[in-house]
Amino acid sequence: MQRGALSPVLMLSAAPEPPPRPPPALSPPGPGSAPRHGSARSGPAPEPSGGLAAALDSSLRAAVAFKAEGQRCYREKKFREAIGKYHRALLQLKAAQGARPGGLPTPSPGPTTSPGPARLSEEQRRLVENTEVECYDSLTACLLQSELVNYERVREYCLKVLEKQQGNFKATYRAGIAFYHLGDYARALRYLQEARSREPTDTNVLRYIQLTQLKMNRCSLQREDSDGGTGGPARNVVG
């Protein structure tokens, strides 16, 4: 009968066969089966984290490398090639910031997911931000060297830089230039005066402030003339 004492083990092995009614002997297999499912779930967990870390590191290295190539092209006055390199660096930065569990579209449903880019250390966040700012700043410099300057893009990139670094002199000055050429003289003057407060003796800033003030004066005179012109004929007709 000592062998009969082993019957619960036999019952355990035989218990999974009849699914209709689980006898009391099925309670041991429950915890026994749970580890199997748990191990299947927990087994692959280290693999995605390692894969994400490798992808993140690779994206950051690629972004820094593309930025360096863009700087080299800019020094060689290959502005179009430099623009392409900076754009590729920004794409790599977006890929790095998108390396989060579950992907970018669904960060909110999971309460355990962090609000910022997942798996980015503080040093990596600083690297991403600094590289992004340098790329946008360099893009504006390249665009301003073009024969046909896209001032809307210059304005867009300058504002992106100022979102991260409000005290960036070059971005402030170039934003003023962009608004000037887009005909928004009030905003142009605001950014240019802000740039002058940081670099009071910069001749380019002072020159653009004078140009902007001249444009604003002309616009105000034209409005006065147009108002007077419409009022003049009306009085003549009445007379």
Swiss-Prot record:
Keyword set, alphabetical order: Phosphoprotein, Repeat, TPR repeat
Residues recorded with modification Phosphoserine: S7, S27
PROSITE patterns hit by this protein: TPR, TPR_REGION
TPR repeats: 63-97, 169-202
Signal peptide: none
Disordered: annotated segments: 1-54, 98-121
Record carries keyword Repeat: yes
InterPro entries cross-referenced by the UniProt entry: AIP/AIPL1/TTC9, TPR-like_helical_dom_sf, TPR_2, TPR_rpt
Source organism superkingdom: Eukaryota
Record has Phosphoprotein as a keyword: yes
SMART domains: TPR
Compositionally biased tracts (Pro residues): 16-32, 104-114
Family annotation (PANTHER family): ARYL HYDROCARBON RECEPTOR INTERACTING PROTEIN RELATED, TETRATRICOPEPTIDE REPEAT PROTEIN 9B
Assigned protein family: Belongs to the TTC9 family.
Full protein name: Tetratricopeptide repeat protein 9B
Gene: Ttc9b
